[in-house]
Amino acid sequence: MSNDEVQNAALAHDLMTSPKSRAHFLKGAAIAAAGLGIAPSIAKAAALDGKTLAGMPETPQTILNIAATAEAAAVTALYNLHVAVNEGRVNTAGIAIPVPTLVHIVRGILRQEQDHYAFLTGAGAKPLVTSFTFPPVILGNAIQALRFLETADEIFAAAYLAANREFAQGGLAKLAQYSYQIGATEETHRSLARAAQGKLPNNRSYVRNLFPNRVGGAVRVFTQLGVLKPGLNYPGAMKVDAILRNSVDHDVSAGVSLRHP
């Protein structure tokens, strides 16, 4: 048995024998099981059952489904932006950083969002939709793309803040941890988008609490913005890997490490 297999077996044992009630802990462990490469049977055993826990206004499954939807939208937008960059269709006039640096930032964020999506769906999260509509201008103008990214990541960070709060209320410490880890990354994306526009990267001492009641508030916002209308299809992991591997520095990781919690 390899070292990875030994570690996975040990983690699997911990997941299945925690002092917490088995049912509640497995809800919280589902993402860990999938994200760390544990055998599919264990991930399946840790699947969410769709029940609402005391103190939570939404089910864990609902929250994770919303998160997967947001990540799918982000991957779709960034993948198509990368395609446009490769084809020389993006006007970069007015950006405050060198173009190669901006390209590396876009590639890194694409990698991270796909990693988030894989992590969530590997544990059973199901996106509400997988086809999205974005303002056409973001695929041809770097400044407009950065403005859109800044806004979108503010919504993402706030949604993960709400998820963190709900999971904490439900006693799901692991899911609260993962929500924080992903949400913190989304906030760095917002800062990078602002820096590339020549703005103060982080202009707030605290992440905005946009959704004080439910994570579902993010769905309403994206619906109002028209993002959830059918349009561009989520490209899938293979296409994301291919565009990262076959262009720019030919690095499928895009320089990103710690690709699971």
Where are these predicted regions, by residue range?
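All-alpha RGS (Regulator of G-protein Signaling) helical domain and cognate RGS-like helical scaffolds
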Residues: 2-20, 27-261
